[in-house]
Each structure stands twice: as structure tokens, then as C-alpha cells.
A protein has these predicted regions:
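Active-site activation/catalytic loop segments of kinase-like enzymes and analogous catalytic loops
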Residues: 290-325, 339-358
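ATP/Mg2+ or Mg2+-diphosphate-binding catalytic cores
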Residues: 189, 201, 213, 217-220, ...
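Regulatory N- and C-terminal appendages and interdomain linkers associated
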Residues: 1-23, 141-142, 167, 180-181, ...
Length: 387
């Protein structure tokens, strides 16, 4: 098994029994995961190795966040503590965490009804409101009472419908979790000194230079294939769009707060029709909250041809605004910033041509078409999020 974790040494940290089987799950773009079966149950073993997110202190912060969210009833899968009480295990210079195994499946927006899209938006709003409650920034009180109200309503609804359940059969033999003391829920988390969540939008001059570089890489690629042809078409098209809209660079962003950072279909597990767990909190950080809502919708509701399902987007956005306490103007500003971000972003092509990493290639046709359609239907997209 490639990159096999040191199970013997790892499991000595936990009251999780002895390993019976360990199989890699579909690898994400950043970290590795394993389905682990032991004499005491089933677990998800996560190997954190992405340099940007694998620092033990950053992982511990993620773990504190999910533990506090779980205490509020938000559907998450907090890690199990080791014998020493820590949730991060460092073995052989590698960093691991042990989580409950959550049975469920991923669902794209096309598989959701309008009502379920509303519940999806409400869930993300609850996450943002709950993070504001359990990891407040210094001096931020906005939304605290609103967050409590909507978390209570969400968890009561989830209890009635069976949503948000976590498997308990595989829990190590530790004391049952109790609600976190109030002082934990009110302690402000430090922000990374390098964090700059209020950056202005991308500089088009930098983007034009990047487009030229990528076009040169496409021309040099041999043998040329259909991906090269599409890449060249989209790069030329994007350059023309950017020249047309170069004066629309957005100013600094609006309200910020703690966000999941990577909310998309492969980081949300459903059991039946209800969300069972939001996973992969590696990108937890302080950023504009409404922008995360827009980015998530652009992934959940994009169609293969590169258009957004606007009726579903509208149901999602209205529910998000209600539970997060976000205003229509916040969403409209976020739509503009994310549109500009997409107009200037070429991460999939950079992975392909600069790193030789093709894992994101299947996403490129729809994602690259979306910004073209979004530019043409800009007013309709804004109305779906803010109307």
C-alpha cells in the first residue's frame, strides 16, 4: 500500500484497539485518508501532509473548532483524543488524526431538490454563525444572538429528521463528551500573522503576464491534445474578457469571520437526504464569509455546460442569508469579488502545465466555461444571490 501509515505506532496513542484492515480512500488534492478497521470499530485516519496546512498548531485549531461546533449540534466529525488528550499525533515526522468513520455519500447540486438546496444554504449559514460564536474575533459581537437562535433551530430540525448523526460504534474508550465550558466558547482565536483577508481583487497586470506564460507552455506541449486546444481557447477568451472588464477590479472586501475555507460537495457527507458531516477543515481561516457562500454555490450548482442553476442558487442563497444574518448587499459584493477572482484565476491550468498534475483536469471544462457565462449573465447571477 503506497504511503502506508505506521499503524502500530499510531494506534498506541489511542484506545482504539488493534488494526485489522487499512485501505486508502479516494485521495483528496491536499491530504491522504484511510478507512481503518480495528478490533474496536471503524475509523477515518487522516494523514496531514500538505505544507500549507499540516502544522500541528493549525491542525489543533481545526480540531478545537470542530469539537466546539459538535457541542452545538453542527454535523461534523471531531477527532478522537489520544491518551495524552491531544488530537494530533506526530509519528516519524508525519502528522495524523483519528476521526470516526462516517457512513454517507457526496451529493452535487443536481441531486438536490430546491428544498434541499435551501437546507444546504442554511447549513453553511449555521456554520458561519456558529464559528462566530465559538471562535469569535477580538471585538466582534455581530450575529452572536442570531447565531444561537439559528443553531438551536437547525439542531432541533436535524434531530427530528435524523440529520447530523455521527457514528458512535467506533469511539475509543474515553469519557463521554460534555458541552464545552462557556469560557472556551467565548475565547477569541488568534489569527495567523500572515492572514490578510481583506486583500483587494487580483491585479489584472499580473493576470495578463500569467496568461502569456501559460499560452507559451501550451504551445510547447507535445504532443498537443484536446486539453491543450481547450486551454488555448479559454486563455485567449479570458484575455479578451479581462481587457473588456479591466476597470471593474473590486476594492477591499467586506465583513470577515472564521470560515470552513473549502466547502464543496466532496467535503459534505449525506446520509439519506440529510447532511451527516462536514469534513476536511484544513482551510479553516478568517476570510469574507459571504464569499465562501458564493464560491460554494459556484461549485455545487454549476452544470456540465458551465452555467449555474439559478433557481437552486436562489433557494440556497436566501436560506444562507437568513441563517448567517448576511445582507443582500453583502452577497452582491461577494458575487462581484468571486466573479473577478474567477476571471483572474488559472489554478487548474497551472497545476497541469507547471506541476504536471492532472487531477483537476476533469473540472476544467465546466469551470472555465462558467466565468464566461457568469460575465454575460452577471445581473441574473447577482439577483439570484441577493434578490
Amino acid at each position: 500500500m503506497p504511503h502506508a501509515p505506521p499503524l502500530g505506532a499510531l494506534l498506541r496513542h489511542y484506545a482504539a484497539g488493534s488494526a485489522l484492515a487499512c485501505d486508502p480512500v479516494d485521495q483528496g488534492l491536499l491530504n491522504r485518508g484511510y478507512r481503518l478497521r480495528t478490533t474496536r470499530g471503524r475509523y477515518f485516519l487522516k494523514h496531514h501532509f500538505d505544507p500549507e496546512t499540516a502544522a500541528p498548531e493549525a491542525i489543533a485549531r481545526q480540531h478545537r473548532a470542530t469539537q466546539r461546533l459538535a457541542a452545538l449540534g453542527v454535523p461534523v466529525a471531531p477527532p478522537f483524543p489520544a491518551h495524552d488528550g491531544r488530537t494530533v499525533a506526530v509519528v516519524g515526522g508525519h502528522t495524523y488524526a483519528l476521526h470516526p468513520w462516517i457512513e454517507g455519500r457526496h451529493r452535487h447540486g443536481a441531486q438536490l431538490t430546491a428544498e434541499q438546496c435551501g437546507r444546504l444554504g442554511a447549513l453553511l449559514g449555521v456554520v458561519h454563525a456558529s464559528l462566530e460564536r465559538v471562535m469569535p474575533l477580538q471585538g466582534r459581537e455581530r450575529g452572536r444572538q442570531r447565531g444561537r437562535q439559528w443553531v438551536r433551530q437547525w439542531t432541533e430540525k436535524g434531530a427530528r429528521e435524523g440529520g447530523g448523526a455521527r457514528t458512535g460504534e467506533s469511539a475509543p474508550h474515553t469519557e463521554p463528551r460534555t458541552p464545552l465550558p462557556a469560557r472556551h466558547a467565548e475565547t477569541a482565536e488568534p489569527v495567523s500573522p500572515g492572514a490578510n483577508p481583506a486583500d483587494a481583487g487580483a491585479d489584472p497586470a499580473t493576470t495578463f503576464a500569467l496568461i502569456d506564460d501559460l499560452l507559451a507552455r501550451v504551445r510547447r506541449h507535445r504532443p498537443a491534445d484536446s486539453f491543450d486546444e481547450l486551454a488555448r481557447h479559454r486563455l485567449l477568451e479570458r484575455r479578451a474578457l479581462l481587457e473588456q472588464h479591466v476597470g471593474r477590479r473590486p476594492p477591499h472586501s467586506g465583513p470577515v469571520g472564521w470560515v470552513h475555507g473549502d466547502f464543496h460537495p466532496f467535503n459534505l457527507l449525506y446520509r439519506g437526504d440529510a447532511p451527516a458531516a462536514i469534513v476536511d477543515w484544513d482551510r479553516l481561516g478568517v476570510k469574507p464569509r459571504a464569499e465562501e457562500a458564493v464560491r460554494a454555490a459556484a461549485i455545487f450548482f454549476v452544470r456540465p455546460a458551465g452555467t449555474l442553476d439559478l433557481p437552486k442558487t436562489r433557494a440556497y442563497a436566501r436560506a444562507y442569508r437568513r441563517t448567517a444574518g448576511a445582507t443582500p448587499s453583502e452577497l452582491a459584493a461577494a458575487v462581484h469579488r468571486v466573479w473577478w477572482e474567477r476571471l483572474n484565476d488559472f489554478w487548474m491550468l497551472r497545476w497541469h502545465y507547471e506541476r504536471g498534475d492532472t487531477r483537476a483536469d476533469p473540472q476544467f471544462p465546466a469551470a472555465s466555461a462558467l466565468v464566461v457565462w457568469w460575465t454575460r449573465e452577471y445581473d441574473a447571477v447577482c439577483d439570484a444571490f441577493a434578490g
